[in-house]
Amino acid sequence: MSRCIERDRRFYDFLVKTRLPMTITDVAHMFYPSPSGNERSSITIAQRRCRELKKMQYIEISNRSFGSCNYYYVGSKPSERSLRHRLLMSHVISTISCNGFNIIDVETEKSFMDGELRSDIYMIIEYNKTKYCLLCEVDLTKPFNTEGYTKLLNKVMKGEIKFPHQLILLSVSDMKLEDSDIKKYITQVDTELKSFNKFLWKFIK
């Protein structure tokens, strides 16, 4: 990638590692923010860099738009069935990244308990010099996996499963969480992320 700038490399590495598609807005916010905070400038830069990366055959650009935006990806094109879900996953990651969090590591579809539970997003994040492990479920058509996460938390509390930092659970869904013993441990925001501040407030002390 000799003609790529550092931000191109980070963008490309993210796509390769997560296999998530991204809209140009999320690409711009996460990888090409304007120093002045001008969103239009940021998007223009991101569009130019994406065209260059496409020419160098590092990324692909969708032939047709999702809503009003093209999306960008590497490898196999996302299926129509999974596209909205996977775009929302990348949107969640981008939103977290742009709200004062340092994303140290990110994995998608991470399995726990010998495959009994598969988390949509696993991240190690840092906020105000404190690191956390974040498990995020993005649910568009099904309720939050209360049973699976109850088992996981029970094992964590017993010391059978260990995380390197404090564990945070995030649900992104428009379906209400069912009443359960673990409900108090879960922060839920809507799929448009209008209520994202509910998540952010957990870290503001």
Describe every region a protein language model picked out:
Residues 15, 31, 50-57, 92-100, ...:
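Hydrophobic, Leu/Ile/Phe/Ala-enriched alpha-helical segments that form helix-helix packing faces
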Residues 138-188:
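Catalytic cores of nucleic-acid endonucleases
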Residues 183-205:
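Charged, structured surface patches that assemble and position nucleic-acid processing machinery
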Residues 75-99:
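Short, amphipathic alpha-helical interaction segments positioned at domain boundaries
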Residues 80-81, 97-132, 140-144:
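Active-site metal-binding core of divalent-cation-utilizing nuclease and nuclease-like domains
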Residues 1-77:
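Nuclease-adjacent, charged terminal/linker segments that flank catalytic cores
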Residues 45-47, 86-92, 146-156:
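Well-ordered, non-membrane alpha-helical segments in soluble/globular domains
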